[in-house]
Swiss-Prot record:
Main location: cytoplasm
InterPro entries assigned to the protein according to its UniProt record, in alphabetical order: ATPase_NBD (IPR043129), Type_III_PanK (IPR004619)
Native source organism of the sequence: Frankia alni (strain DSM 45986 / CECT 9034 / ACN14a)
Function: Catalyzes the phosphorylation of pantothenate (Pan), the first step in CoA biosynthesis.
Coiled coil feature spans: none
UniProt-annotated catalytic positions: 105
NCBIfam families named in the record: baf, PRK13318.1-3, PRK13321.1
Family note: Belongs to the type III pantothenate kinase family.
Protein name: Type III pantothenate kinase
Enzyme class, spelled out: transferase
Lineage: Bacteria, Bacillati, Actinomycetota, Actinomycetes, Frankiales
Any GO BP: coenzyme A biosynthetic process
Pfam families in the cross-refs: Pan_kinase (PF03309)
EC number(s) given by UniProt: 2.7.1.33
Complexes and interactors: Homodimer.
């Protein structure tokens, strides 16, 4: 079984693949201060009886990746390990001004999106930030859009506006909020859906083609039903990319 680990700024998504099938998955809080010893205990607890035969990792948090490397050496020392970083074979041409700026998670999303749906495609990743990653018909990463994520936007409002506070992220009864809570929920959910729809339409117009729009990320389920442009919802797109990149390198 392959252990796939996607370390994000807020959460780490962990998956176990049995061949092509995702057998199990977990979402845990990313702790950049966790030691290798603490990570060994965490992963042993998660994995239980799963017999791991390989490990594939991507990370957007350098501090967390350092300790994760040490954990892998301790817990999986004799197994093949792929860490997505500059020089790793991904099969994804990166056609932006500075390819080193492209996050490993964005490249994994590009790889998985083209594998599953072909191209052109737009991956909309709802996480700490809301990322729109654009995939060409040939599977190239050609750039995209970065915007504040839903929770970051809500945190900013709650911290800077004296009479506003954090609210539960659930759809309100209507777009027109009947209370401060509902108005905030409407702005977060319908506002982000409208933002994404506008960006997807602009990207499609720039491409001159109907690119398949694929939603992923921990907050995608909040927006998918309210969007007019998202075609697919693949919650574990990054993990699928990690499986594919492992196969390319081992």
């Amino acid at each position: 079984m392959l252990l796939a680990i996607d370390v994000g700024n807020t959460n780490t998504v962990v998956g176990v693949f049995d061949g092509d099938d995702l057998a199990d998955s977990w979402r845990v809080r990313t702790d950049p201060h966790a030691t290798a010893d603490e990570l060994v205990l965490l992963y042993r607890g998660l994995l239980g009886e799963h017999r791991i035969t390989g490990v594939s990792i991507c990370s957007t948090v350098p501090a967390a990746l350092r300790e994760l490397r040490r954990m892998v050496v301790r817990a999986f020392r004799d197994l093949p390990v792929v860490i997505v970083e500059p020089g790793t074979r991904t099969g994804v041409p990166i056609l932006i001004d500075n390819p080193k700026e492209a996050g490993a998670d964005r490249i994994m999303n590009t790889l998985a999106a083209h594998h599953l749906y072909g191209g052109p495609a737009i991956v909309v990743d709802f996480g700490t930030s809301t990322n729109l990653d654009v995939v060409s018909a040939r599977g190239e990463f050609i750039g995209g859009v970065l915007a504040p994520g839903i929770e970051i936007a809500l945190d900013a409002l709650a911290s800077r506006a004296a009479q506003l506070r954090k609210v539960e992220l659930t759809p309100p009864r209507s777009v027109i909020g009947k209370s401060t809570v509902e108005a905030l929920q409407s702005g977060m959910i319908y506002g982000v859906a409208g933002q994404v729809d506008g960006l997807v339409r602009r990207i499609r117009a720039e491409l001159g083609a109907h690119a398949t729009a694929i939603a992923t990320g921990g907050l995608a389920s909040l927006v998918v039903k309210e969007s007019e442009t998202l075609d697919r919802h693949e919650p574990h797109l990054t993990l699928i990319g990690l499986r594919l990149v492992f196969e390319k390198n081992i």
